[in-house]
From Swiss-Prot:
A Pfam entry, by short name: RNA_pol_Rpb2_3
Function: DNA-dependent RNA polymerase catalyzes the transcription of DNA into RNA using the four ribonucleoside triphosphates as substrates.
Region (Disordered), start-end ranges: 1033-1053
Keywords recorded for this protein, A-Z: DNA-directed RNA polymerase, Nucleotidyltransferase, Transcription, Transferase
Lineage, broadest ranks: Bacteria, Pseudomonadati, Pseudomonadota, Gammaproteobacteria, Pseudomonadales
Primary gene name: rpoB
Protein's name in the database: DNA-directed RNA polymerase subunit beta
């Protein structure tokens, strides 16, 4: 196995037993692929598929005028170049978007001609607003902040059959219903009521008998009965009738008379129930008709209208129940043969027949009027309006669309062969749905499970953006249609017809404020990846928290390999927000698919097939861990499999597929938890969620015990810098890496230089610090895709969210009671859990009514010391250390004329005007914040002169850019001349500076020759002359291109900024705040074991082992058994082994042992037992072995993948190799007394995360502050600078102590007694410390509330 440049430096020992069949797919592909399909930017306009923008345009255009004499057709669209790149957009606070230009064609027809001859065609490109673009990491920059559009899980369009679970009617009877859900348009529901009639609802309105809908479609009562019932034929006589016998229909009936065969033998006696045996005998006897008494007809229902042949009038209508008089009437009319509906109680009920009886309508028009009245109550119906409404409901393409998915699901559910068809409903669709519903009510067929992932589909970014775009286009369509009639007469161009505002507004609204467009969670790389892979059932067209029941939130068998069963938020959204499983993807219909390996005749192949939940249920699927032999044949007699959403066993021959990997069940976050298989699910959920809240530490440290997914997450998250092309590192410093690209990977005429500018100390959305550090050295050879620089929480290209801490499980003086954590001062000293937070503080200078605000260092009534950190423009300088209340940006605001006191008048007379007509509104550092200024940005409105600071920042940026371009040119030039040197060396010249014809070029001569003179050489070989010309041209072009780029940058920097109305200047100051770990901070392991630091203990007081090594953290052992997350204990043991091995290697290096010994030890560690992933140490050079060992000093990193991790025996073996006790326990001594503890203690290394719940952000104290308006009580919460609530239980406590005066003070002057508190303040000023409590304001509020109820209440003074 070949290792990449970074993997070689620190190889993880992998404990997995199963070979890897497929790599983890790119983690952000769900976002990127969807948006790529939406824009189709790389595709030529004529090759574009009908998806995304193209489909939206196609569905709305052509727009035809009302008269039909003009039409506007869509030709194609193109997306321009964005004005600013992503970084510039974030700085300037604008949206990263590109202009969308649409080519449309206006066609005007000749009114006079009969066959619509074309009179005029105009084609033009129309600007349709800005289209936000996705960054390469799957995010959008909207108004300068990074946002993510979360995919939505919604009910797939199609038809669903369901019942109410017996909740509607008191009898508990199941009422069945069918619902046709389109992608857009009206919903159509059919439902049974408790009396078994079928009703229809449109858009969940009032219900009507279902036959009204069918009658509206043009069916008569006879046709309806014919569609839904079979008939029995009778030929009538006066006494007896003959029934055409279909024996199977008699089953279950009670014979009302003896049934005899043709010879007169009785087969069924009167009063007996007819069974299957009787039916067989009847069939055997070959009876085709039965003589039955006329009474047998009573209660049956006529299937067809009885028409008097002579007069043509209807004697008896169809669906009439036969009674004695009806039968007599029929006989009198001389009708011999009649047909009745065949119904029974078992499997064909009289539902449609009953429905027709309650149907008041007789003609299609009456039916349409009924439907019109239901949809638009109170409007008078006309024939046209009724027909129009009905046709627009389900049969018009503009108003109704099932979409390809809906049509496929509908056809599949109704048992049809083809999966395509039209987007609107057909008559057959409606009838088939009704037939299926009635069949289900009759006991044939099953209702659907709406929580099955085969019935829920994922809407990704592209699809949601397309829908929004279509909404905008439809708004435009109306306006265009009205203007088209003018186009003919006034000769308008397409541009005059289309107003792009509504489209742009719809798109902007979606990206800016849709429920699914969320502020990106940017705590660390994992939280970014997880946020982009999130799947939410909430949002427009989805569920709401309040209404979602348990079933929707629950884990469903079809989640297997598609949606993670572990990772979901705790709280009201549990189960509604899910995470995509590691290997899952969504197919063209939007259903989630999971990959499986094909199994043929019990042999596992390497062919991988993706199956959706619909397809999967028919197959037998084995687990990834099923035992196989060398020939990949399944060895067990019975294999554990999944089949039809159940877990069962099956013989190997019956198996069709097998999982690709044990971790395909879980999401990325869950797959980062080692020994996940030993943790309780609830705790694993917390572990997965808390990893997303880990703050990047100052020095990242990779976990000693990982799962092997760390590298994938770090690289796919996009926080690292990876090489675009292979090559050699030309130069590297803190801020950029320059790579000279391999010749093979450079295209002709290309520079062959890649410059990577690193992101230094930038603020993330969560105020954590994004910083990239290069991990390559000059001269290193790298390949494409290698990690060149680590991002936040990344260590040598692997995700590193926390720190490896030496922990002991033991109680310690109650300091770790109830999940508290005791940490050693050593952790603070070594800055192990120190984090950097960056806060952005913004100062805005506006134009006010009294004049404009000014940013200046000349602030009234402020001492010299307060201004010491400001420059002459009034802005703090970079590097200043500031604390609470310090001025960052000096700003003065003009204030209105006020009445002046005599003293002020005197001052004005002496010092002139300035002092008093402005007030100080400077931007100060908020309370509780201390930090260093690391960056300042100044934005000035167009047309306003820039101050000195803005100009200096601008110059600095330009200089940096110029240096980049210069360096790039220098390297390109160097590479060009190197190539020329190689080509020209030893070649013959025709002429050249100081050369004779026919001379050979020497390397020394060329080295001396000034570079400008190289191109004066004329060579004998014509190809070389061409090369010289090309190179000269190439360098010339490059120079011009650089100048153009520089001018573009300069233009961008020097133009004014587009600021909000009324804003003159914005100054943004960035503070870097260093947060050490302290009591009150929240920390957690990866197994849901979270706690708050209770104390930081001096090193000398911490428990230590016999070698004098203290532990870093003491955890409570009681946190393990009841929580059932034993994974943390196994992690601790394996961590101890990993660290021990590291120390062993470290000792060998310090003793300067030979390389062979190191190789032997590494071989013992990496390649001992039945590991599948052997490490090929021979492929590493001695130098690489030494570098590897040096990196292993801190511990040998291990990978124990989920559900395929290290077994107990392997952990023990590792402990042995490290020279530790296999129990994993150590004798510890008390740091304060030096006595040994009574029994050995589990000591080891656990990976600890510092979560973004820091005491500094929560701690807060109030002296005086604002009060609530109504109750006059202090506000609550840190944001409002509020007070601490003294609640009812606290009042009880003071009552219990009898502390009457303290209590009175709490309830009056300290809370809401307005007069009391002002009086008390005055008293304190006068040096008199008495308080006189008055009436609390909340009592007055109570009195007012009682009065508002109409109860008279008065306060009487005694």
């Amino acid at each position: 196995m070949t290792y990449s440049y970074t993997e070689k430096k620190r190889i993880r020992k992998d404990f997995s037993k199963l070979p890897s069949v497929m790599e983890v797919p790119y983690l952000l592909s769900i976002q990127l692929d969807s948006f790529r399909d939406y824009l189709q930017m790389e595709t030529a306009p004529e090759d574009r598929r009908e998806t995304g923008l193209h489909a939206a345009f196609k569905s709305v255009f052509p727009i035809v005028s009302y008269s039909g004499n003009a039409a506007l057709e869509y030709v194609s669209y193109r997306i321009g170049e964005p004005v600013f790149d992503v970084k510039e957009c974030q700085l300037r606070g604008v949206t990263y978007a590109a202009p969308l230009r649409v080519k449309v064609r206006l066609i005007i027809y000749d009114k006079e001609s009969s066959n619509k001859a074309i009179k005029d065609i105009k084609e033009q490109e129309v600007y349709m607003g800005e289209m936000p673009l996705m960054t390469e990491n799957g995010t959008f920059v909207v108004n300068g902040t990074e946002r993510v559009i979360v995919s939505q899980l919604h009910r797939s369009p199609g038809v669903f059959f369901d019942h109410d679970k017996g909740k509607t009617h008191s009898s508990g009877k199941l009422l069945y219903s069918a619902r046709v859900i389109p992608y857009r348009g009206s919903w159509l529901d059919f439902e049974f009521d408790p009396k078994d009639a079928v009703f229809v609802r449109i858009d969940r309105r009032r219900k009507l008998p279902a036959s009204i809908l069918l009658r509206g479609l043009g069916y008569t009562s006879e046709q309806m009965l014919e569609m839904f019932f079979e008939t029995s034929k009778f030929s009538l006589g006066a006494e007896v009738c003959k029934l055409e016998l279909v024996p199977s229909r008699l089953r279950g009936d009670i014979a009302t008379f003896d049934i005899k065969d043709n010879d007169g033998n009785v087969i069924v006696e009167e009063g007996r129930r007819i069974t299957a045996r009787h039916i067989k005998q009847l069939e055997k006897a070959g009876i085709t008709e039965l003589e039955v008494p006329t009474e047998y007809l009573y209660g049956r229902v006529l299937a067809k209208d009885m028409i008097d042949q002579s007069t043509g009038e209807v004697l008896v209508e169809c669906n009439t129940e036969l009674t004695e008089e009806v039968v007599t009437k029929i006989l009198d009319a001389g009708v011999k043969d009649i047909e009745t509906l065949y119904t029974n109680d078992l499997d064909c009920g009289p539902f449609m027949s009953d429905t027709l009886r309650i149907d008041p309508t007789r003609t299609p028009l009456e039916a349409l009027v009924e439907i019109y009245r239901m949809m638009r109550p109170g409007e008078p119906p006309t024939k046209e309006s009724a027909e129009n409404l009905f046709n627009n409901l389900f049969f018009s393409e503009e108003r109704y669309d099932l979409s390809a998915v809906g049509r496929m699901k509908l056809n599949r559910r109704l048992g049809r062969e083809e999966s395509t068809g039209e987007g609107t409903l057909t008559h057959d669709d409606i009838i088939d749905v009704l037939k299926t519903l009635i069949a289900i009510r009759n006991g044939q067929g099953q209702v659907d499970d709406i929580d099955n992932l085969g019935n829920r589909r994922v809407r990704c970014v592209g699809e949601m953006a397309e829908n929004q775009f279509r909404v905008g286009l439809v708004r435009v369509e109306r306006a265009v249609r009205e203007r088209l009639s003018l186009a003919e007469s006034e000769g308008l161009m397409p541009q005059d017809l289309i107003n792009a505002k509504p489209v742009a507004a719809a798109v902007k609204e979606f990206f800016g404020s849709s429920q699914l467009s969320q502020f990106m969670d940017q705590n660390n790389p994992l939280s970014e990846v997880t946020h982009k892979r999130r799947i939410s059932a909430l949002g427009p067209g989805g569920l709401t928290r309040e209404r979602a029941g348990f079933e929707v939130r629950d884990v469903h068998p079809t989640h297997y390999g598609r949606v993670c069963p572990i990772e979901t938020p705790e709280g009201p959204n549990i189960g509604l927000i899910n995470s995509l499983a590691t290997y899952a993807r969504s197919n063209s219909y939007g259903f989630l698919e999971s990959p499986y390996r094909k199994v043929v005749d019990g042999v596992v192949t390497d062919e991988v097939v993706y199956l959706s939940a619909i397809e999967e249920s028919n197959y037998v699927i084995a687990q990834a861990s099923a035992a196989t032999d060398e020939g990949k044949r399944l060895t067990d007699e019975l294999v554990t499999v999944r089949h039809q959403n159940e877990f069962t066993v099956a013989p190997p021959e019956a198996v069709n597929f097998m999982d690709v990997s044990p971790r395909q069940v879980v999401s990325v976050a869950a797959s980062l938890i080692p020994f996940l298989e030993h943790d309780d699910a609830n705790r694993a959920l917390m572990g997965a969620n808390m990893q997303r809240q880990a703050v990047p530490t100052l020095k990242s440290q990779v976990p000693l015990v990982g799962t092997g997914v760390e590298r994938t997450v770090a690289q796919d998250s996009g926080v690292c810098v990876t090489a675009r092309r292979g090559g050699v590192i030309e130069s590297v410093d803190a801020a950029r890496i320059v790579v000279r690209v391999n010749n093979e990977e450079t295209e002709a005429g290309d520079a062959g230089v890649d410059i990577y500018n690193l992101t230094k100390y930038t603020r993330s959305n969560q105020n954590t610090c994004i910083n990239q550090r290069s991990i390559v050295r000059q001269g290193d050879v790298i390949a494409r895709g290698d990690v060149l620089a680590d991002g936040p929480s990344v260590d040598l290209g692997e995700l590193a969210l926390g720190q490896n801490m030496r922990i002991a499980f033991m109680p310690w003086n109650g300091y770790n009671f109830e999940d508290s954590i005791l940490i050693s001062e050593k952790v603070v000293q070594e800055d192990r859990l120190t984090t950097i937070h960056i806060q952005e503080l913004t100062c805005v200078a506006r134009d006010t009514k009294l004049g404009s605000e000014e940013i200046t260092a000349d602030i009234p009534n402020v001492g010299e010391s307060a201004l010491s950190k400001l420059d002459e423009s009034g802005i703090v300088y970079i590097g200043a250390e500031v604390g609470p209340g310090d001025i960052l940006v000096g700003k003065v605001t003009p204030k209105g004329e006020t009445q002046l006191t005599p003293e002020e008048k005197l001052l004005r007379a002496i010092f002139g005007e300035k002092a008093s007509d402005v007030k100080d509104t400077s931007q100060r550092v908020p309370t509780g914040t201390r930090g260093t200024v690391i960056d300042v940005q100044v934005f000035t409105r167009d047309g306003i002169e820039k101050d000195a600071r803005a100009l200096s920042i601008e110059k600095e940026q330009l200089d940096k850019y110029r240096k980049d371009l210069k360096d790039e040119y220098r390297i390109v030039e160097g590479a060009t001349f190197e190539r020329l040197m190689a080509a020209l060396k030893g070649q013959e010249v025709i002429s050249g500076p100081g050369l004779k014809k026919g001379a050979k070029l020497e390397e020394a001569y060329l080295a001396e020759l000034p570079r400008a003179d190289w191109f004066k050489l004329r060579m004998k070989d014509e190809a070389l002359n061409e090369l010289l010309e090309k190179s000269e041209q190439g360098l010339e072009d490059r120079k011009k291109e650089h100048e153009a780029r520089f001018d573009d940058k300069k233009g961008k920097l020097q133009q004014g900024d587009d600021l909000a109305p009324g804003v003159l200047k914005i100054v943004k100051v960035y503070l870097a705040i260093k947060r050490r770990i302290q009591p009150g901070d929240k920390m957690a392991g990866r197994h849901g074991n979270k706690g708050v630091i209770s104390a930081v203990m001096p090193i000398e007081d911490m428990p230590y082992d016999e070698f004098g090594n203290t532990v870093d953290i003491v955890l409570n052992p009681l946190g393990v058994p009841s929580r059932m997350n034993v994974g943390q204990v196994l992690e601790t043991h394996l961590g101890a082994a990993a660290k021990g091995l590291g120390e062993r290697i470290s000792r060998m290096l310090d003793e300067q042992r030979k390389v062979a010994e190191l190789r032997k030890l590494l071989d013992e560690i990496y390649n001992h037992s039945d590991e599948v992933f052997k490490v090929d140490l021979d492929s590493l050079t001695d130098k690489e072995i030494f570098e590897l060992c040096n990196n292993l000093r801190g511990g040998v990193p291990m990978a124990t993948p989920v559900f395929d991790g290290a077994k107990e025996a392997e952990v023990k073996r590792m402990l042995e190799l490290a020279g530790l006790d296999t129990t994993g326990q150590t004798k510890l001594y008390d740091g304060r007394t030096g006595d040994a503890f009574d029994r050995p203690v589990t000591v080891g290394y656990m990976y600890i995360l510092k979560l973004n719940h820091l005491i500094d952000d929560k701690m807060h104290a109030r002296s005086t502050g604002s009060y609530s308006l109504v109750t006059q009580q202090p506000l609550g919460g840190k944001a409002q600078f509020g007070g601490q609530r003294f609640g009812e239980m606290e009042v009880w406590a003071l009552e219990a102590y009898g502390a009457a005066y303290t209590l009175q003070e709490m309830l009056t002057v300290k809370s809401d007694d307005v007069n009391g508190r002002t009086k008390m303040y005055k008293n304190i000023v006068d040096g008199d410390h008495r308080m006189e409590p008055g009436m609390p304001e909340s009592f007055n509020v109570l009195v007012k509330e009682i009065r508002s109820l109409g109860i008279d209440i008065e306060l009487e003074s005694e």
